[in-house]
Amino acid sequence: MTFFISFRYLLEFFLFKIIIFLLFPFSKKMSSKIISNSFMFLGKLSKYNQIAKNNCKMVFPNLNEKEITKIINNSWQNLGHNLFELTFLKKILKDKNKIEIKGLDVLEKIRKENLPVIFFSIHSSNWEVCVPFLDQNDFKTGAIYRHINNTFLNRYIYKQRTDALKTNDSFYTPKGKKSAKEILEGVINNKNIFLLVDQKDSAGTEVNFFGKKVKTQTGFLKIARKYNLKIVPMKNIRLPNNNLEITFEQPLLHNNNEVSDETKMLEINSIIEKWIKQSPDNWFWQHKRFN
């Protein structure tokens, strides 16, 4: 990394910290609103706004420009809420009124079976609460994450994530060869896996997603088959009052040798598509998913 890039990353990090400091006198509700609106304003000026619009038009070809713009504006606001909520992630998990849970019967059945499972979700609402929630409810979980380029922000985000964990049994591991090893060791030691499976994986398999063949991660399905792990959909949405709602849906199985990984991923993608169509404002449209 060159000196100038390092210096730029440092400036970005200090700017972020200064903004958070300046918001200190305001309530969390007001601060979150300021950050979310700022994200929307700045986001609309960035190149990612057009990427988001193109993605949205592909998924909703019948919507007009005004309707598409509204979805993308709300998506930018959701990202702003996420960024601010990351600064007090641990407190969010302690607030019993902030996160509403549905599908508790599914979760309790998994608890009683006491076998590792694969939880999956998408970049929707505040996805950062998922792993700490599982950990705080006694589900030892390993999660793979993609590090961001800014090393200072990356360190800060990692610390916020790990500080929100209740135990030392759960962990985060950066995507790569090391993560594959750590995740497998976790399964062997009766730990669960949590994955966000909606983003592009250049090394992945081409699977239909909203009618288009896209590179998709399917490696976790090989683990599910080998260790006979249930695959649990974990839907996550942001409610109108800015609270969060997590729904545990009925587990999927991948123990039929006649069903390929691609076919099973197609089933998972159909679940993801349903979630996105139900709550389009919540999804991370800015990612080059269909490129």
Where do the PLM segments sit?
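Non-catalytic C-terminal accessory region of glycerolipid acyltransferases
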Residues: 70-73, 109-112, 136, 177-291
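Active-site metal-coordination segments of metallo-dependent hydrolases
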Residues: 51, 150-151, 214-217
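A conditional alpha-helix N-cap/helix-loop micro-motif detector
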Residues: 99-100, 124, 150, 173-177, ...
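Catalytic core of membrane glycerolipid acyltransferases/transacylases, capturing the structured
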Residues: 113-175, 202-206
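Membrane-anchoring hydrophobic helices of lipid-metabolizing enzymes
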Residues: 2-121, 156
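Short, composition-biased local secondary-structure segments
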Residues: 21-26, 126-128, 153, 181-194
